[in-house]
Every structure is written in C-alpha cells, then in structure tokens.
Amino acid sequence: MDLFNYSRRETSEVNIGATPMGGSNPIRIQSMTNTATQDTEASVAQAKRIVDAGGEYVRLTAQGIKEAENLMNINAGLRRDGYMVPLVADIHFNPKVADVAAQYVEKVRINPGNYVDAARTFKHLEYTDEEYAQELQKIHDRFVPFLNICKKNHTAIRIGVNHGSLSDRIMSRYGDTPQGMVESCMEFLRICVKEDFTDVVISIKASNLSLIHISEPTR
C-alpha cells in the first residue's frame, strides 16, 4: 500500500435512509448518543446536536426490547422537527432486539460474536466438522428471518466485528488471529449473499494494532 498516494477502493453503494454510503458517495460521519434510549426527549435532543454539528448518521444503543421499541418514538420526534437523519441501532447478545429495532431505524448493527453464539467464556471448544456445520446452520436459521425483516422495512445492516468479543467457537478454531476476525464476518456475509441482501456495511476492529494486519490473500 502506498501511504502517500492513497485512493479509495471501489465499493458497492449501500442504501441507508436518504443518505447512502459507499460507491461514489463521500465518506459519511456518524456519532453515537450516550443518553438512555428509553429517554425519548434526551435522545432526540442529543441526536439533533449531532446533526447540527455535521453528523450524517446517529447511532443509539438498544440493550433490550423496550429500548428497541422506543426507537420508534425517537425517530418520530426527529422527523416531526424536520431532522431526517438515518438512525442506527446498536445490538448485542439478543437477536430478538435486532428484529424489533429493524422496524424503526435505517440501519442495525449486529455483533457476529454474540448474535447467536453464547457469551464468550474464554473456553477452548472442540468441534467435529459436522458439529461446526451445525453451529453455522443455527446462525443461518436465526439470521435469515432478521434479513427478511430488514428487506421488508428497507433497513440496512452493519456486520460489526470486535476482536474483543469473538466467540469461543471462532477463537477455538482460528485462534487469536486476523483470520478469525474475517471468518466471523464472512459467516454472516455469505448468508447475505445467498439471500441477495446487499445493503450491508462491514466493520472489523481491534485495539491490538499488531493483530489487524491482514494479508492480501485474506483480504
């Protein structure tokens, strides 16, 4: 990579409300609220401040069903006041919350490390190839209904991989490696391709910089 003559890679355009990203669109600016998502007034007010400061997407956490349901009120409050900013719901641990949030926001972020797999316990797990395939089928069976909800509501998704929350299953098979991070994403991305769902954003991050160097063949 020539760091002094950088050029953007050609990417697919992803529809996120009325503010698409990727393709020939400019790099978008997103910020996240730190309000309680059940506090409609505070969340709307902070989202407005983000937009007024130049934010193009506003992300809110949705820890549970109640928070996900209240995204409808936050969205309505913003639109009522003329703020058409796309909202992004941040989901961890509970795919049912993602199902609800997808009905009220323009994009939903899921974490592959805890969307279907159990919370990380740092245990080494042994799988036969057949058992591993069964685990992948569980992901497929849970993820496809979510994609169908997103299709119905024109909701984009972000597959957001965190090195710190890779599942025990991925860690046991691939180790603490860039390949494990990539495969955690690809398990979900392959399903998106199979289901012809293209409004997908990908993020892969790690706090350990020595870990995020990914070789060209992997990329």
Task: Place the predicted regions along the sequence by residue.
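Alpha-helix-loop-beta-strand connector modules within alpha/beta enzyme cores
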Residues: 67-88, 138-152
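Active-site mouth loops of central-metabolism enzymes
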Residues: 25-42, 87-93, 170-180
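Glycine-rich tight-turn/loop motif centered on a GG-T
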Residues: 4, 105-142, 169-180
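Residue-level detector of conserved catalytic or cofactor/ligand-binding positions
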Residues: 210-219
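Glycine-rich, proline-tolerant flexible connector loops at the mouths of alpha/beta enzymes
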Residues: 34, 55-78, 112-131, 200-207
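N-terminal amphipathic alpha-helix/helix-capping segment at the start of soluble metabolic enzymes
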Residues: 1-31, 151
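Structured alpha-helical segments in the cores of large, soluble enzyme domains
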Residues: 17, 40-50, 98, 146-152, ...
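Hydrophobic faces of well-ordered beta-strands that scaffold small-molecule active sites
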Residues: 27-33, 58-60, 87-91, 108-110, ...
